[in-house]
């Protein structure tokens, strides 16, 4: 069951009646920005390479505690 040209025209007329001809470009622009933002966020979710920790890079440090008597 495919959507034909007649059904698409009816849907378009209903959208124009609901939102008005002036509002449709604004809605399309907002939808486009949302899709672009979604795609950008999906690209950011690529797996991050794990960093291997080696014992050779560990630095030993000694912490000295100083106290002042008031």
Swiss-Prot record:
Keywords: Cell inner membrane, Cell membrane, Membrane, Protein transport, Translocation, Transmembrane, Transmembrane helix, Transport. GO terms for cellular component: TAT protein transport complex. Disulfide bonds: none annotated. Pfam families: TatA_B_E. GO terms for molecular function: protein transmembrane transporter activity. InterPro entries: TatA/B/E, TatA/E. It is a single-pass membrane protein. The chain crosses the membrane at residues 1-21. It is found in: Cell inner membrane. Gene3D superfamilies: 1.20.5.3310. It comes from the Bacteria. GO terms for biological process: protein transport by the Tat complex. The Tat system comprises two distinct complexes: a TatABC complex, containing multiple copies of TatA, TatB and TatC subunits, and a separate TatA complex, containing only TatA subunits. Substrates initially bind to the TatABC complex, which probably triggers association of the separate TatA complex to form the active translocon. Part of the twin-arginine translocation (Tat) system that transports large folded proteins containing a characteristic twin-arginine motif in their signal peptide across membranes. TatA could form the protein-conducting channel of the Tat system. Belongs to the TatA/E family. This is Sec-independent protein translocase protein TatA. It comes from Campylobacter curvus (strain 525.92). The lineage of its organism: Bacteria, Pseudomonadati, Campylobacterota, Epsilonproteobacteria, Campylobacterales. The gene is tatA.
